[in-house]
Amino acid sequence: MKTLLLTLVVLTIACLDLGYTKTCFNDDLTNPKTTELCRHSVYFCFKNSRIAGGVERMQRGCSLTCPDIKYNGKYIYCCTRDNCNA
């Protein structure tokens, strides 16, 4: 009986994947690609690029929501896989 209970607990933890956290790139164009572990409730990686004075500026990181804003030369890309915001 104890073996069955232990098996059920292990299967429950494996199915819920309690320890999973998303990783996203968090650099800009001037730094080498580095990653960050996102908070538990974060579902999106983002890449935000804009052109200012003829120079492309870019930011990457984790985001709770996925804003779909495209204005003033600004572009935001969101994705849900690990390190998908390269």
Curated annotation (Swiss-Prot):
Its main location: secreted. The keyword Secreted applies. GO terms for molecular function: toxin activity. Expressed by the venom gland. GO terms for cellular component: extracellular region. Pfam families: Toxin_cobra-type (PF21947). Residues 1-21 form the signal peptide. PROSITE patterns: SNAKE_TOXIN (PS00272). SUPFAM superfamilies: Snake toxin-like. The keyword Chloroplast does not apply. InterPro entries: Snake_3FTx, Snake_toxin-like_sf, Snake_toxin_con_site, Toxin_cobra-type. It is found in: Secreted. Keywords: Disulfide bond, Secreted, Signal, Toxin. Disulfide bonds join 24-45, 38-62, 66-78, 79-84. Belongs to the three-finger toxin family. Short-chain subfamily. Orphan group IX sub-subfamily. This is Cardiotoxin homolog TA-ctx-like.
